[in-house]
Curated annotation (Swiss-Prot):
Pfam families: ArsA_ATPase, ArsA_HSP20. It comes from Synechocystis sp. (strain ATCC 27184 / PCC 6803 / Kazusa). InterPro entries: Anion-transp_ATPase-like_dom, ArsA_HSP20-like, ATPase_ArsA/GET3, HSP20-like_chaperone, P-loop_NTPase. Transmembrane segments: none annotated. This is Putative arsenical pump-driving ATPase. Signal peptide: none annotated. Belongs to the arsA ATPase family. It catalyses: arsenite(in) + ATP + H2O = arsenite(out) + ADP + phosphate + H(+). Its EC number is 7.3.2.7.
Length: 396
């Protein structure tokens, strides 16, 4: 199954682009599902029909759905949420506060992606288009298998079994003192199942032969900067971007003096889009004279963007991690981090793991054996790649 995630700053038009992309894929005979994971859904408005949690046929070969995040959250995390709520209420918090604190930031977004993984496993469609890709919080949760895998396997799994076995013996003594029960098997199983879901999801998202991100942006300073940051963070987590779409460009036919400054600024930032995202391909879409609402309007956007192309193709295979062997038994680990100054990157090697931190984003890379036995011997930024040299430690 081909998976395409549309992302971009709010208001850039990613829902319209997602819907138009779905139209073209369906037109070519691909069974296509456009799934909105944005809490503020607008996919139904874009198609101009009612959509719900389950896929609905829009036209031949095309289905649409708007994810109910609360329903997904309850199905995947309900037992843990109820238990944490019980514990917090026993400590004096009221019901609403306790329920809010029982949900980790980003979990609603991550379970939206878990829903995507379920469609992927069921293989009911040829193309799956996600409207609104993960936020930074949800992306950080994708690093859970690397950061927490060792602890989950060695500590949580044994603790899980021991807790379930001892609960009948300890519960009569524990509850009168604590004011709440010990977690039961359903509660203890949920975190590990969550970890396994994220681990499986990560494998899908980082497979650049099937999954890629489409960045939708506008030729404006703030929007462009946000898009560049998103591209860098996606690269940090090894999620490939294959296409950039510059949307809402003022047509040349507009000659009203009021828009001349806007047009001039757009030309500057449009060129920056091409320069900053090179070598990624860039497509342009104009600001239309009407809202992209309804199939007729989306057909115009579809024809402008793709003409006779198949949008399910992978436009560019972005290699975000490379390992290059040197001539002196040394290696270079190359991480694609576009637009990130070297000064903002922090590195730390512990055992066979390399910790890479950029601001609030962190990734733990498990090093292959050849690199794990060596020590970092320098780093430099070159052509948007952070190149970290590994060599044998100098003996003193």
């Amino acid at each position: 199954m081909r998976v395409i995630l549309m992302t971009g700053k709010g208001g850039v038009g990613k829902t319209s682009v997602a819907a138009a992309t779905g139209l073209r894929c369906a037109e070519l005979g691909h069974k296509t599902l456009v799934l909105s994971t944005d809490p503020a859904h607008s996919l139904a408005d874009s198609f101009d029909l009612e959509l719900g949690h389950e896929p609905r046929l829009v036209k031949e070969n095309l289905w649409g759905a708007e994810l109910d995040a609360l329903m997904e959250l309850e199905g995947n995390w309900g037992a843990v949420k109820r238990y944490i709520t019980q514990v917090l209420q026993a400590r004096g918090l009221d019901g609403v506060q306790a329920e809010e604190l029982a949900i980790l930031p980003g979990m609603d977004e991550i379970f939206g992606l878990v829903r995507m993984k379920r469609h992927y496993d069921e293989a009911d469609y040829d193309v799956l288009i996600i409207d609104s890709a993960p936020t930074g919080t949800a992306l950080r949760l994708l690093s859970l298998p690397e950061v927490g895998g060792w602890y989950m396997r060695r500590f949580y799994k044994p603790l899980q079994g021991m807790s379930v076995a001892l609960r009948p013996l300890v519960e009569p003594l524990f509850r009168p003192i604590a004011g709440f029960s010990l977690p039961d098997k359903e509660v203890m199983d949920a975190p590990y199942e969550f970890y396994e879901q994220i681990e499986a999801l990560e494998k899908v998202l980082t497979d650049n032969t099937q999954t890629s991100v489409r960045l939708v942006t506008n030729p404006e300073k703030m929007v462009l900067k946000e898009s560049l940051r998103a591209h860098a963070y996606l690269s940090l987590y090894n999620v490939s971007t294959d296409l950039v779409i510059a949307n809402r460009i003022l047509p040349e036919t507009i000659d009203d003096p009021f828009f001349q400054r806007w047009k001039s600024n757009q030309q500057v930032y449009k060129q920056e889009i091409y320069d900053n995202f090179h070598p990624l391909p860039v497509k342009e879409a104009p600001l239309f004279s009407e809202e992209m609402c309804g199939l007729a309007a989306l057909e115009r956007l579809k024809d402008t963007l793709y003409k006779d192309e198949d949008p399910s193709q992978v436009y560019y295979k972005e290699n975000t991690i490379n390992i290059v062997q040197g001539s002196n038994n040394d290696y270079s680990l190359e991480l694609y981090l576009p637009g990130i100054p070297k000064e903002q990157i922090q590195l730390n090697k512990t055992g066979d793991e390399l910790n890479v931190r950029i601001g609030n984003h962190r990734r733990n890379l498990v090093l292959p054996q050849a690199l794990a036995a060596l020590s970092p011997a320098g780093a430099k930024m070159e052509d948007d790649y952070l190149k970290i040299r590994f060599a044998e430690a100098v003996k003193r």
